[in-house]
């Protein structure tokens, strides 16, 4: 599929907080299993209570992504 930096991708990993969400590929590292770093607009639930802080990125395998 050859995903590259800057591509818009949809997340297929069902257990992911961002399942079926669209994000932007921030980097691709071919040496590891989860080598595609994807950046999202919304944060996940790991922020401290009462703040909007949280993770904006997560790593995925290329097989867990579809081009959007």
From Swiss-Prot:
Residue stretches in coiled coil: none
Localization of this protein: Cellular thylakoid membrane
SUPFAM superfamilies, sorted: Electron transport accessory proteins
Function: Stabilizes the interaction between PsaC and the PSI core, assists the docking of the ferredoxin to PSI and interacts with ferredoxin-NADP oxidoreductase.
Classification via Pfam families: PSI_PsaE
Predominant location category: membrane
Top-level taxonomic group: Bacteria
Assigned protein family: Belongs to the PsaE family.
Keywords: Membrane, Photosynthesis, Photosystem I, Thylakoid
Lineage, highest ranks first: Bacteria, Bacillati, Cyanobacteriota, Cyanophyceae, Synechococcales
GO BP terms, alphabetized: photosynthesis
UniProt cross-references to InterPro entries, sorted A to Z: Elect_transpt_acc-like_dom_sf, PSI_PsaE
Protein name: Photosystem I reaction center subunit IV
């Amino acid at each position: 599929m050859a995903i590259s930096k800057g591509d818009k991708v949809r997340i297929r990993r069902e257990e992911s907080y961002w399942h079926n969400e669209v994000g932007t590929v921030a980097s691709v590292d071919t040496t590891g299993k989860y080598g595609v770093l994807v950046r999202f607009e919304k944060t996940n639930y790991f922020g401290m209570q009462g703040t909007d802080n949280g993770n904006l990125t997560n790593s995925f395998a290329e097989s867990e992504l579809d081009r959007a």
